[in-house]
Amino acid sequence: MTKIQLVDDEPNILSALRRLLKPQGWEVHTYNTVESALGGLLEHDYAVIVSDYQMPTADGVTYLQFAKQRQPDAMRLVLSAHGDRSSMIKAINQAEVYRFLSKPWDDYEVVASIQSAIDLYRLKLENRQLREEVDAQKAMLRAREQELLRLESENPGITRVHRDTDGSVLIGDHDG
């Protein structure tokens, strides 16, 4: 199940977001302090982390920067009533925030933004898996190439196949 972390110092905001997101089939974890949210990062792997921009002990960008170090694949969103341009730029540049959502929010926009973030998260994971598969296949090909080179050096001509004009493999001495 896809896990989402919500961090906001206002319990009413967390409750409203949980009610909005739970019906989507996502596992929603809510934290009303940065400290408790940090513990959540150690216990769970999140696809999406949504943080309030302004909280008493730390701002959301600072928290999301830390979250990025702990869970680099998780998509990060900021939710804020303070949607000034400099806040957005700071969030994007420092925490590589995927999206900046404003309070009060539009339910459809929040759900669509989180779904889009989840889709991107899954693509990132799939991309990594495919890169790992390609790397493994390249390593296997290099090993086979080394084996062919070894065989060729021990038995010159062993790796060459002689074919007739119709594609049939010819067996025997065909040098003359």
Listing of model-derived features with the role each one plays in the protein:
Residues T2, P11-T30:
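Two-component/phosphorelay signaling modules centered on CheY-like receiver
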Residues T30-V48:
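Acidic, metal-coordinating helix/loop segments flanking the phosphotransfer/catalytic sites
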Residues N32-T33, D59-T62:
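Acidic catalytic/metal-coordinating carboxylates
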Residues G39, V61-D73, K90:
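Short amphipathic alpha-helix used as the core "switch/output" element in two-component signaling
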Residues D52, S80:
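Active-site residues of response regulator receiver
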Residues M55:
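Receiver (REC) domain active-site loop signature in two-component systems and cognate sites
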Residues W105-I114, I118, R122:
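C-terminal output helix
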Residues Q129-G176:
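C-terminal output/effector regions of signal-responsive regulators
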